[in-house]
Amino acid sequence: MVGCDSIPHGSGKREETVAVAASKAPPPRGVTVLLVDDQPIIGEAVRRMLSGEEGISFHYCKDASAALAKAAEVQPTVILQDLVMPEIDGLTLVRHFRADERFRDVPIIVLSTKEEPAVKAEAFAIGANDYIVKLPDRLELIARVRYHSRGYVALMERNEAFTALEASRQVLANDLATAADYVRSLLPPPQERGGV
């Protein structure tokens, strides 16, 4: 992929319904960071900050136009991204991530040199979850990455549990309908009442 690097740190219906629920991708475990920034020196600096941290894998994408494809590949639990990039500006990229069903809920932390309150407010208004001025302290960056990832993983686990519960409810409803049909088939046909 151009401009992106990874640094890995019963009834037939019943089986069908359960298979559909089981085919959903499980929620991500651990912390997977995707950094989108056109400056390789920033990519290297962030990689060094996160290296050695247990449970964190880091992926870097230099080309903002390849960011969605890279995100689909690595399934990040948090996205760090710059605002000023040549192909696609950072605010537009936030909009692209939020418009894509796959990444709608993935936390986005803007990592930028811009400190103006109006820029920060706009980033939050279009869907960024956090805003850090480059380059933050290592401990702060790790804390924010872990915090946002924890929230995202909890959301995915909740959604997975809800999907499984809904699939189970549907299986029970189908089983009840099948049982009701069977019981009705055992009953004698209704008698017509005639006049006496």
Q: What positions do the PLM features span?
A:
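Two-component/phosphorelay signaling modules centered on CheY-like receiver
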Residues: V31, P40-H59
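Active-site residues of response regulator receiver
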Residues: D37, D82, S112
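The feature encodes the CheY-like receiver
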Residues: I42, T77, P86-E87, R95, ...
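Active-site beta3 strand of CheY-like receiver
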Residues: V74-L80
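C-terminal output helix
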Residues: A118, L135-V145, S149
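… and, occasionally, acidic/histidine-rich disordered N-termini of signaling adaptors
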Residues: A164-V196
